[in-house]
Regions:
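Transmembrane beta-barrel domains of Gram-negative outer membranes and organellar outer membranes
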Residues: 20-259
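Cleavable N-terminal export/targeting peptides
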Residues: 1-25
Length: 259
């Protein structure tokens, strides 16, 4: 019975893989906040820096994205964080390890449409005591992209749950993002993102901005530059447009190598 099940799975998966290999790839630009629906094999380094009323924070990350099959991708990301609060000593060290599984749900080459879904798991490799992490969280998501005339449109929605007893500011959080890019040439694409964050549950200090039950709204203008074939540099600045905000600004930058 075991061998029969394995044979049946192979017969089902092989045609799917062959069809996916025969179809041309659908490429989209690289936002800095919104998740992409593309199944890809890449190395990426990224940097974030934000300023808020509590202080400043920076993060440098390295990530590997690897397709197990043409419709299943695994990503591993390891961040290194630096925190500089206004009322405490600065701290630095590794943050929470992030593991992501992404599955291609629908692909239409004719209509230039991709839809993917999956989940991200955050593991407590960061220090809770030093404010660098410590939470275990899971975040299911759905993301899709479509080519509309000269524009690429990408949308994503995700919900994060905290799974352990380390209570942080993001115990439950809903995010929804929309990104529009305009490829002006093969090497340059400007884009604009609309990013929303709704904190459903989470700790809030007495002097902190009250964000629970509120929807934060951010606009993120940015651009992609392809300095070399297979390499893309992306950069954007996330700016709040709502009264309730987690930060005053956040700078995103990253370099992606396709291989």
């Amino acid at each position: 019975m075991r061998h029969a099940c394995a044979l049946l799975a192979a017969l089902l998966l092989c045609p799917m893989s062959a069809m996916a290999d025969e179809e041309p790839d659908i490429k989209f630009f690289y936002p800095v906040v919104t998740r992409r629906p593309v199944i890809e094999r890449e190395l990426e380094t990224s940097f974030q820096h934000s300023k808020s009323r509590e202080g400043r924070a920076s993060q440098f990350s390295g990530a590997l994205e690897w397709p197990i099959t043409p419709w299943w991708q695994v990503e591993v990301e390891m961040p290194f964080a630096y925190r500089n609060p206004n009322d405490a000593a600065s701290t630095a060290g590794p943050g929470n390890l992030e593991l992501q599984n992404k599955f291609l749900l629908w692909k239409s080459v004719q209509h230039l449409v991709l839809v993917s879904g999956g989940f991200e798991l955050r593991l407590p490799s960061g220090s809770e005591r030093r404010g660098l992490g410590g939470e275990i969280a899971v975040e299911p998501f759905v993301t899709g992209g479509i080519g509309l005339g000269p524009f690429d449109v990408i949308a994503a929605i995700a919900y994060e749950w905290n799974l352990n007893n380390v209570r942080g500011p993001r115990e439950q959080e809903l995010t929804a993002d929309l990104a529009v890019g305009w490829p002006l040439s093969r090497w340059f694409t400007p884009f604009l993102e609309l990013n929303t964050v709704s904190k459903i549950q989470g700790q809030e200090g007495e002097d902190a901005v009250k964000l629970r039950g509120r929807t934060q709204l951010y606009l993120t203008p940015g651009f992609n530059v392809r300095p070399l074939p297979g390499a893309t540099f992306r950069m954007g600045v996330e700016l709040p447009v709502s009264g309730r905000r987690e930060f005053d600004y956040r700078i995103h930058a990253g370099l992606v190598w396709e291989f």
